[in-house]
C-alpha cells in the first residue's frame, strides 16, 4: 500500500543502513597499517571496485538531489550542466593511466605532491589550501543534502534540519576517521548497489507505473521542462564542471589508488559511463514530480533538493520507501566520504608536513583522524548557513576550477610550465573569480569563465617568459 508518509519500518531500514555504514568503517580499520593504506588503500583497487566508487561519488547529493531540484524548477538545465562534466570525466579517464604511472614511479599520492616535485613547496601549499577549501565546501553540500532528507523525517520523529546535519557529520566522521580510503571504497561499493537498485531503477519505474506508462508522462509534460536553452549562468556552470574535472582532487586520488595503469583507465571510464546513464533519469525524476507530488508538499520542505525523496515517499509502499531513501542517503555519503578523505590528506600530508617534514607516520595517522573530525565541523557550519546543496557545490567548485584546473593539467603534461607560471595562473584565476562575483557576475556570465581565461593567460605567458632561466623538473613515467 502506498502511504504518502514514512512508516516505522521505513525509519528502521534507514537506521539500519546508517548503522551498517558505521560498522563497515569499524571493521575495515584493521586493514589500515600505514599512511599509504589510509590515503590510497595500498594502491590495491581493481577496475570494478573503482567503477563503483567513481560512479557513486560523482553523482553525490548535489548530483542527484540538487540536479533533480534544478530539473524540477528549470527543466533541461539539469542536463545541460551535467553533460560537460560527463565529457570532462571521459577525457580524465584517458589521463588516469598516466596519473597512475606517475604516482607509482615517483611516489606521488596527490596533486599537491606532483606540484611539489615539479614546482616546489610554495606551489604545493597554495594548491593544498585551494583543495582544502573546495573539499570542505563539497562535503558541506553533502551534509546539506543528508540533513534535508533527515529533516523530512522530522514530522515523524521530531528531527530538525540542524540535528539532521549533526547526525550526518557524525556518521561521516566515524567511518572515514577510522578506516580511511579502505572504508570509503568498501562502503562505496555497497552504496553503489543501493543507489542503482533502489533509486535509479525503482523510483523511475514506479513513477511510470503510477502514471500509467510513458505516453501519459509525455502527454502531461510541460513543454518548458523539456526545451533546451542556455544563458550566461549555464555557461558558467558548464565551464566550471568541465575545467574542474582536470583537477578534481578526488579523481586524481582514484587514479593513484588503482593497482595499475589499466585498472585506473578502465575503472574511471566504466564509472563515468555508469554516471552518464543516470543523467536522463535524474532529469526524469525531477520533472515527473510535477505530475505526482503536490507542489505544496515540495514547498513545505523549503527546498527543491527534496524533490526525489518526496517523490519516493509519495509513490512507494512501506518498506520500499525506506530502501529508496537509504539509497539516496548512500549516494550522498559516498560523495561525502571521498571528498572528506581528500581534504584530510591535503591538510595533513600536503600542508602540515611541509612545515613538519619529520613527522612520524604514527603521529601523521593520528592527525588524519583529528582532521577527519575537525573538517566536517567546518562543513557543518557552511551547511547551516547555505541550505541548498547545488548552490554550495557551485560556489566551492567555481574558485577551484578557475584557479587549479589548467595548472594541474600543465603539471602533468607541459614541460615548459614553471613555478612562476603556475603560481601566477592560480593567483589570477582565483582573484578574477572573486572580483567577477563581487561585481555581480556582469552579463549574467558565471565567474569561472573569466577566471579560467585569466588563469590560462597568466600560466602560459609567465611560464614561457621564465622557462629558460628557471625550468622545472618534468616527471616522465616512460623514462627509466
Language-model regions: role of each:
Residues 1-480:
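Membrane-embedded helix-loop-helix hairpins and adjacent transmembrane boundary segments
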Amino acid at each position: 500500500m502506498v502511504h504518502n508518509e514514512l512508516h516505522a519500518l521505513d525509519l528502521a531500514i534507514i537506521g539500519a543502513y546508517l548503522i551498517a555504514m558505521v560498522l563497515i568503517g569499524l571493521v575495515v580499520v584493521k586493514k589500515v597499517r600505514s599512511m599509504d593504506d589510509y590515503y590510497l588503500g595500498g594502491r590495491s583497487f581493481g577496475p570494478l571496485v573503482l567503477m563503483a566508487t567513481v560512479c557513486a561519488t560523482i553523482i553525490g547529493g548535489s548530483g542527484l538531489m540538487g540536479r533533480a531540484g534544478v530539473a524540477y524548477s528549470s527543466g533541461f538545465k539539469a542536463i545541460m550542466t551535467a553533460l560537460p562534466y560527463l565529457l570532462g570525466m571521459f577525457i580524465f579517464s584517458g589521463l588516469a593511466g598516466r596519473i597512475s604511472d606517475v604516482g607509482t614511479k615517483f611516489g606521488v599520492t596527490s596533486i599537491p605532491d606532483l606540484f611539489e616535485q615539479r614546482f616546489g613547496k610554495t606551489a604545493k601549499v597554495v594548491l593544498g589550501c585551494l583543495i582544502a577549501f573546495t573539499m570542505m565546501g563539497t562535503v558541506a553540500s553533502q551534509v546539506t543534502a543528508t540533513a534535508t532528507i533527515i529533516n523530512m523525517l522530522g514530522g515523524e520523529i521530531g528531527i530538525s534540519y540542524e540535528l539532521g546535519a549533526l547526525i550526518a557529520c557524525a556518521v561521516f566522521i566515524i567511518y572515514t576517521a577510522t578506516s580511511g580510503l579502505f572504508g570509503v571504497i568498501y562502503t562505496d561499493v555497497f552504496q553503489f548497489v543501493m543507489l542503482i537498485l533502489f533509486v535509479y531503477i525503482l523510483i523511475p519505474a514506479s513513477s511510470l507505473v503510477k502514471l500509467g506508462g510513458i505516453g501519459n508522462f509525455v502527454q502531461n509534460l510541460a513543454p518548458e521542462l523539456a526545451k533546451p536553452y542556455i544563458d550566461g549562468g549555464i555557461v558558467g556552470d558548464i565551464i566550471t564542471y568541465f575545467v574542474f574535472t582536470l583537477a578534481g582532487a578526488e579523481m586524481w586520488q582514484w587514479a593513484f589508488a588503482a593497482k595499475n595503469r589499466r585498472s585506473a583507465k578502465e575503472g574511471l571510464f566504466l564509472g563515468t559511463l555508469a554516471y552518464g546513464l543516470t543523467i536522463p533519469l535524474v532529469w526524469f525524476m525531477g520533472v515527473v514530480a510535477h505530475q505526482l507530488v503536490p507542489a505544496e508538499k515540495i514547498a513545505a520542505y523549503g527546498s527543491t533538493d527534496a524533490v526525489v525523496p518526496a517523490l519516493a515517499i509519495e509513490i512507494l509502499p512501506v518498506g520500499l520507501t525506506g530502501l529508496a531513501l537509504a539509497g539516496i542517503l548512500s549516494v550522498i555519503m559516498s560523495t561525502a566520504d571521498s571528498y572528506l578523505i581528500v581534504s584530510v590528506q591535503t591538510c595533513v600530508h600536503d600542508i602540515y608536513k611541509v612545515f613538519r617534514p619529520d613527522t612520524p607516520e604514527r603521529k601523521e595517522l593520528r592527525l588524519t583522524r583529528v582532521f577527519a573530525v575537525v573538517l566536517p565541523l567546518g562543513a557543518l557550519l557552511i551547511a547551516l548557513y547555505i541550505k541548498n546543496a547545488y548552490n554550495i557545490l557551485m560556489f566551492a567548485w567555481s574558485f577551484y576550477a578557475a584557479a587549479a584546473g589548467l595548472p594541474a593539467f600543465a603539471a602533468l603534461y607541459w614541460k615548459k610550465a614553471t613555478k612562476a607560471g603556475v603560481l601566477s595562473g592560480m593567483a589570477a584565476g582565483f582573484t578574477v573569480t572573486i572580483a567577477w562575483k563581487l561585481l555581480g557576475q556582469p552579463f549574467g556570465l558565471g565567474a569561472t569563465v573569466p577566471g579560467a581565461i585569466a588563469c590560462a593567460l597568466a600560466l602560459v605567458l609567465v611560464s614561457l617568459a621564465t622557462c629558460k632561466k628557471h625550468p622545472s623538473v618534468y616527471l616522465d613515467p616512460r623514462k627509466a
